[in-house]
Amino acid sequence: MAYQQLRNAVLAGAALTLGACGGGGGGGTNFIPSPPVTPAPEPPPPPPPPPPPVPSTANVFPGLTQSTQFAATGYESGGSSGNDMSVRYDASTGDYIFDLPSAEPGRFSPQYNAWSGAIVDSSGTVSTGMTIQDPTALELTYTTFARYSPTNGYIPSGYVAFGSATPEGAVPVTGSASYTATLAGGSPGGDLVVLDGTAALNFDFGAGTLSGSLDASLSGEWNGAGPYHFDFVNTVFSTGSTSFSGQLSSTGVQGMGSFDGRFTGPNAQELMGRWQIPYVDWWGNGGSAIGVFVGHKQ
C-alpha cells in the first residue's frame, strides 16, 4: 500500500513537470524570436562647395592704387625682344594691359583661375593665352613674369618679366648685396622648357662691379639638355646704375650666352631681366634657349 502511494505521487509530479514545460504535446506557448531591426540608412553626404568664382580682373600687385607703367623685358620665340613689350596697370578698371609683339594690345582676363587666362583686345577678341606667376610664391612684391602663347597652341611663345622700376638715384652707392633669382624660359620652338633654373647676382655698389652665375636644366617630352653652369663674364654695371648686363660662359657647351636686367622696387629690393644661353640636347643638336629671370635681395 505504501509503495503504491509513493509510485502514484512520483507519476503525478512528473506529469505536472511535463505540463509546465510544454512537453508531452501539451498546450504550452512556443517562443518566436523577433526579426532583426534594420538600421536606418545614413543620410547622403552634403555636396561639395562650389568652386570660388573666377575674378574678373587680376590682382597681381595688391598694393597698387594708381595707374602704373611697368618696366618690361623678355623674349618671344620669333626673336622679338623686351624693347617691343609693354605692361601697364589701369587703376580705373583694375586691368593689366599687355602690348606684346605677337598680339594686339589687350587686358589680361582671368578665365581658369586668378592667374591663368588670356589677353582680350578692345574688340573682345582673344588671341593669346597667358599665365601670370603669383609674385608672392617667389617671395616678391614688385616684380613677376608671365608666359604666353597663341590660343590655338599650348607651347609658350614668349616670356615677359615686368615690375616697378627702381627710380634713378634710389640704387645704393655704398656697400654690397647678393640677389637670388628664378629662371623661366625654354627653346624658341617650345619643345624644351626650363625644368630647374636659378641665378645668383652679387653687386658691389661702391665699386660698381657685378659677379655671379646662372644654372639651368632644360627638359622636354623626349629630350633634354644640361644641367649647365654659366659664369658671369664681361659684366657691365656702374655705381648708382639702375641696369646691368653681361655675358655667360660655360665649360659644358660651346658659345657664349648673355643677360641684361634692371632693379625693381623703391630701393632696389628686387630685380628682373632676360637671358639667352646655348645648349646641346640629348641627341647632339645645338640650340639657343631664351627666357627671363626675377629675384630679390637676400
Question: Where on the chain are the PLM-derived regions?
Answer:
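Mature soluble binding/inhibitory domains
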Residues: A2, G22-Q298
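Bacterial N-terminal signal peptides that target proteins for export
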Residues: M1-V10
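C-terminal motif of bacterial Sec signal peptides marking the signal peptidase cleavage site
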Residues: T17-A20
